[in-house]
């Protein structure tokens, strides 16, 4: 699947309601109907209703990178999370909730405790599954470091979709002796797709 990152286009900067037709306009610009629109969203803030309305108007689904920037301990089975699920359900569109992705990388604050990560992923999944049948839980590690990926897998009951972030990198795991110049990037998917078919 291919997509486009339009968030840095100056026509679409600022509040999402400033350009209420941005997804429809983009579809018209490229002459294609897009199926999914991706947005980053900070855990602890309310469900992005305006964005969901734009996505619905464009005839698509929303992929929401739901990021607990304050750390995993901020994720609780509380009124906030239940309201988020109810608002996601009320959006009336498919929502792919990409919760705390790239967890195997040291650059995110939810890295470092696989047991706690799995508990929090399972918690969010249960609340979404119980309250919002239109929400699919997406587990999405980074392709590197590959050796840590499986430590963070929260289990089949919690994961509806599996994805992977793959970035252009000249070396595997930052090791200059492992050149990736002629490596097919799809081989990175083997780490998860061969284990979790």
Outline where the language-model segments fall.
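A general marker of short, structured functional hotspots
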Residues: 1, 8, 15, 19, ...
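N-terminal carbohydrate-binding/catalytic regions of secreted carbohydrate-active enzymes
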Residues: 2-94
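Short, flexible, glycine/charge-rich loop motifs used to bind or transfer phosphoryl groups or to couple energy/partner
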Residues: 25-28, 151-153, 191-192
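Glycine-enriched alpha-helix->loop->beta-strand junction motifs that scaffold or abut catalytic
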Residues: 33, 60, 157-162, 197
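Glycoside hydrolase catalytic-domain groove-lining segments
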Residues: 50-60, 65, 167-197
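Active-site cleft segment of glycoside hydrolase catalytic domains centered on the general acid/base Glu
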Residues: 79-161, 165-187
